[in-house]
Amino acid sequence: RSGALPAPVPAHARKRPVESDESDGSLDACVLAKELGYTGVSSKACKGVYRSILNRARCAHWNGRAGEERYFMSAEDLIVQAGVSLQQDLSLATIIGCTHGERNGHHYVNGLAGAPREEQTRVLNAYPNLYRRGDDGIVRLSIRGGTIALGDLATIGFGSRAEI
C-alpha cells in the first residue's frame, strides 16, 4: 500500500485502465490515485459501504467531466464468509453498478460448514439461487458458468432477509 501511491503511473501504462486496489487505505486515497494517473478503484465492503458509494460518486463525476467512461470501480471480496457478510458485499457491488467482481472467499472458506445444519437450511431456503447444497450436505455459494445469481438479494434488509 505505501509503495504504490507515492509514484505516478508511468506514461506507457496510462494507455490502459489501472486500478489502485490495495492502495485504497483512506477516504482520500481514490482522489490521490486519480492525480497519479490511476483510473480505477476497488470496492470492498470491509473498507466501508460509504467509502464505496463515495468513490462511485467520484467516478461518475469524473466521467461526466471527461465526457467518457474513463474512471471505474471493481468489486472484490478478499475473504468474505458465506452468509450475511457475503450477501451484503454482493449487494454493495450491485448498488454501485459493478457487473463483474473478484470473488475469493469461496476458495478459502468451506461455505457455511461452520454453521449448524438448521442455519444452513434457513439460509438456503431464503436464498435458493444464491446458494446450493453440495453432495456433502454443506451449503455454499452457487457459481454456475462463472456467474452468481443475485436476484435473491433484491429485498428489504440489505441482503439479509433470512432469520438466522
Language model feature labels by segment:
Residues 1-75, 84:
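Catalytic core of soluble alpha/beta enzymes
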Residues 65-164:
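Flexible C-terminal active-site loop/helix
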